[in-house]
């Protein structure tokens, strides 16, 4: 994020795109050559074969009959929808008075992702001490609190809100995706792929809607909409039961 902003200021959008592409290629090569071999891997028939299709369809039916998985997939949808919406449009708020940040300063907002990395690592601790459902509820409440703080015209309070929001999103995502794997024993890969499809669909669906809200009503309406979305996620957790 930071390098692309720096490249855009010096070489334009083409330079920024080239920078991102090169870093992506380097990361792919590192992943290919540094990843250790899979452990406890068991090959299965591809869905293209008759046996594979039957196995895939049977697994899918089993997963779709679990209401808790539907809840977790929906929470993933709502979580990333909120997250992408905030980071898509917070820059427009910060470039306006009373903040009037430069492009380089706006790029530095993504340093707050550091809190997300710490939160993801702490999600296991949260699950052990509070249970996955309670921890997920706490993270959704923290996400809402962070959103409300971004309404402030104080840069310190706004950044605190962004930090809390980011922490809560990454921890919530880690908790929800982990719960999907625990629920879908024997079919974790398929359940996780559905979760990810729902997760990214949330970004695709909510991002443009929030953009229209920003264009018409500005930041307070954006926050109101996203607090409602997070509140829906919080209500859905009640269907998960204690865990």
Where do the protein language model's features map onto the residues?
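Pair of pore-lining "gating" transmembrane helices in MFS-fold secondary transporters
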Residues: 65-85, 163-167
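Juxtamembrane intracellular "pre-TM" segments in multi-pass secondary transporters
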Residues: 35-75
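Symmetry-related core transmembrane helices of the 12-TM Major Facilitator Superfamily/SLC fold
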Residues: 15-33, 221-238
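C-terminal transmembrane helical hairpin of 12-TM major facilitator-type secondary transporters
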Residues: 133-176
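A late C-terminal transmembrane helix in Major Facilitator Superfamily
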Residues: 182-219, 225-226
């Amino acid at each position: 994020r930071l390098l692309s902003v720096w490249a855009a200021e010096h070489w334009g959008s083409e330079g920024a795109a080239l920078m991102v592409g090169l870093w992506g290629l380097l990361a792919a090569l590192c992943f290919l050559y540094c990843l250790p071999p899979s452990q406890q891997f068991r090959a299965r028939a591809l869905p293209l074969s008759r046996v594979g299709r039957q196995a895939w369809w049977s697994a899918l039916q089993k997963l779709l009959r679990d209401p808790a998985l539907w809840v977790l997939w929906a929470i993933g949808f709502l979580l990333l929808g909120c997250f992408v919406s905030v980071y898509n449009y917070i820059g427009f708020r910060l470039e306006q008075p009373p903040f009037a940040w430069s492009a380089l300063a706006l790029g530095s907002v993504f340093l707050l992702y550091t809190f997300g990395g710490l939160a993801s690592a702490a999600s296991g601790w949260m699950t052990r001490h509070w249970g996955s459902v309670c921890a997920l509820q706490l993270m959704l409440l923290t996400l809402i609190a962070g959103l409300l703080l971004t309404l402030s015209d104080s840069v310190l309070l706004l950044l605190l809100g962004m930090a809390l929001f980011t922490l809560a999103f990454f921890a919530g995502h880690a908790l929800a995706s982990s719960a999907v794997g625990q629920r879908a024993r024997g079919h974790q890969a398929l359940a996780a792929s559905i979760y990810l499809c729902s997760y990214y669909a949330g970004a695709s669906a909510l991002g443009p809607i929030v953009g229209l809200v920003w264009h018409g009503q500005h930041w307070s309406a954006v926050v109101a909409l996203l607090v409602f979305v997070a509140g829906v996620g919080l209500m859905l957790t009640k269907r998960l039961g204690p865990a």
